[in-house]
């Protein structure tokens, strides 16, 4: 059974000491999504939302979220991130509902991974889209948020299988 590394001998929270870990290149890819109605889909696609360019703003929010993960997730180490990218892809197969898939990729060269940074970026991106379009419809659905893959580090690589 795997031990919880964020709990000390007294059962209290602690930040894991990574001093003795090797510096390696680490990358994580996360996914989230938001399902919107046709009006919001058209506003985003045509860049006609009254609050501005929704995707550009959400992309910046995702980047900022990755950079600030250690300030909102208590046991995350502050990391010198070397790359952050946010991609969007529309799924139009269930019209009149449209799902915007969000993929975030975060990289570093360091002693601990960037999974939480990628997940935080994906979440903040979806939340920003909700915030910027909620005046049109509050019934949007933020979908599953999960780690797609990670590479580097002691625990090795991870690739989510389609049936997970």
Curated annotation (Swiss-Prot):
Residues annotated as catalytic: 131
Locate the transmembrane regions by residue number.
Answer: none
* Presence of the UniProt keyword Acetylation in the record: no
Reaction catalysed? (8S)-3',8-cyclo-7,8-dihydroguanosine 5'-triphosphate = cyclic pyranopterin phosphate + diphosphate
Q: Which GO terms describe its biological process?
A: Mo-molybdopterin cofactor biosynthetic process
Question: By its UniProt entry, which InterPro entries does this protein fall under?
Answer: MoaC (IPR023045), MoaC_bact/euk (IPR047594), MoaC_sf (IPR036522), MoCo_biosynth_MoaA/MoaC (IPR050105), Mopterin_CF_biosynth-C_dom (IPR002820)
The UniProt record lists the keyword Lyase: yes
The entry marks the following residues as binding substrate, namely 75-77, 116-117
Entry's EC annotation: 4.6.1.17
Give the protein's biological function: Catalyzes the conversion of (8S)-3',8-cyclo-7,8-dihydroguanosine 5'-triphosphate to cyclic pyranopterin monophosphate (cPMP).
Q: How does it assemble?
A: Homohexamer; trimer of dimers.
The UniProt entry's sequence similarity note says:
Belongs to the MoaC family.
Q: What is this protein called?
A: Cyclic pyranopterin monophosphate synthase
Its lineage opens with: Bacteria, Bacillati, Bacillota, Bacilli, Bacillales
